[in-house]
Amino acid sequence: IFLRTEKHPTVDQLKQQIDYTSLDSFYEKEENFEEVYGQIAQFIVQKGKEEDLVFAVPGHPRVAEKTVGIIEGLCKENNIELDIIPSMSFVDAMYNYLGVDPAEGFKLLDAFELEESYIDTSTNTIITQIYDPFIASNVKLKLMEHYDDEQEVCIVVGAGIKELESKTYVKLYELDRHQELFSYLTSLYVPRSEKKLYNTVHDL
């Protein structure tokens, strides 16, 4: 059993019941996440050629888990049998916790890809990987190009983990002032806005 990361509260329960290998060391070897995802995928596929294994990730394996997509592609190339088992995603947990219907529409974005992403203010948005104040500050500045500074956003921590989950509503300009809220369990929910700032060709 291999875990992409053991930086998740539920892993404490696993420690008491099963033996596993954490792949957090890959994050220390590479400079960017794309390299990390690729290296982890290569490692898992190579191990899969030698023996049956389980590769576990937090939440749903097809939601914001790039390693799974890379592994799937490599398995097809190498004729390795792969079984992807679904689970509740953090997106499901967030919407349930916030009391919002995802059928109203939403967009899922990665904080590290925000510069290249199209920000659609007319739909609800969830932004992942906001795990420290520096990233939060960059996200704030990017969003302020598209939203009003007074736009209300919600910092969500540990959605779906009852003993840890919290939600804090703040104005967009205040986002990076709440340093204690940012960790590997933090995501940002940005409700759709009626106001539009015309800053890009897409907005015209």
Language-model regions: role of each:
Residues 33, 66, 95-96, 138, ...:
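Short, well-ordered secondary-structure micro-motifs
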Residues 55, 59-128, 177-179, 195-196:
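Class I SAM-dependent methyltransferase SAM-binding "motif I" and its flanking Rossmann-like core
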Residues 19-21, 98-103, 171-173:
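Short, hinge-like loop/turn segments at secondary-structure boundaries
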Residues 1-83, 178-179, 185-187:
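Class I S-adenosyl-L-methionine
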Residues 4-6, 23-26, 58-59, 88, ...:
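Fold-independent oxyanion-binding glycine-rich loops
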Residues 49-53, 120-204:
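A contiguous loop/helix-start segment that scaffolds small-molecule binding in enzyme catalytic cores
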Residues 43-46, 97, 142:
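A generic secondary-structure signal
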Residues 8-11, 28-29, 88-93, 115, ...:
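Short gly/pro/ser/thr-enriched loop/turn and capping motifs at secondary-structure boundaries
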